[in-house]
């Protein structure tokens, strides 16, 4: 099935919305040892993951199309193995992250995520990686970043007993198809489809989820 790439302006606005949502929700976290929907992670670890991912995105952009991520996706194995390798990378990076309060990690995330947003417009059509013979651009990966930020905004919301829905959930569908090509997107209402495809349950306030 052919999927039309999402509109650039919508992706950029959705990206910024996700960063703002994470910052706003993190400001309301009072217990950083609270459990999250992300498996065994507490809120402090989710904040650390956000910092690591935002810093990685800057690295991947700088090194594209020969980044660590591009080399990982160039491997032609099963998607499940790719997912496990990414999970191991997440765990390893979190393990060596310096100890710091949750708000400090969120501030570092915001700085890196903002720098990424400033850089990507001028590199939108540059090749970011190749997966199973298809070239994916910096703009495509910006869509993946949108998905990442809004999913983790939802995680933070559930951690503090709230719900969350992106302002423009519809753009996350093509963003997923072009930014997360190794994972299928289930059918359904756009935001619920994204939640379910990531391993989250829209109906439950807590439970294990993909990262």
Range-by-range predicted roles:
Residues 80-95:
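A basic- and aromatic-enriched beta-loop-alpha substructure that forms the phosphate/nucleotide-
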Residues 1-14, 18-24, 28-42, 59-80, ...:
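Structured surface interface patches that mediate subunit assembly and partner/cofactor docking
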Residues 49-50:
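Glycine-rich loop at the start of a catalytic domain that most often binds anionic cofactors/ligands
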């Amino acid at each position: 099935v052919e999927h039309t790439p999402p509109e650039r302006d919508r992706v950029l606005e959705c990206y910024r919305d996700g960063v703002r949502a994470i910052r706003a929700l993190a400001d309301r976290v009072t217990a950083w040892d609270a459990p999250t929907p992300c498996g065994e992670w507490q809120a402090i670890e989710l904040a650390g993951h956000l910092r690591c991912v935002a810093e990685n995105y800057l690295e991947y952009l700088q090194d594209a199309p020969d980044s660590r991520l591009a080399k990982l996706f160039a491997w032609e194995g099963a998607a499940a193995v790719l997912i496990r390798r990414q999970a191991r990378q997440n765990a390893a990076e979190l393990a060596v992250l310096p100890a710091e309060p949750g708000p400090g990690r969120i501030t570092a995330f915001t700085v890196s995520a903002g720098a990424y947003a400033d850089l990507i417009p001028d590199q939108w059509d540059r090749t970011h990686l190749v997966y199973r013979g298809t070239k994916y651009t910096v703009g495509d990966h910006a869509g993946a970043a949108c998905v990442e930020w809004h999913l983790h905004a939802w995680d933070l919301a559930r951690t503090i007993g709230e719900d969350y829905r992106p302002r423009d959930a519809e753009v996350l569908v093509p963003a997923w198809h072009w930014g997360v090509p190794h994972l299928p997107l289930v059918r359904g209402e756009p935001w619920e489809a994204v939640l379910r495809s990531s391993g989250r349950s829209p109906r439950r306030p807590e439970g294990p989820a993909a990262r």
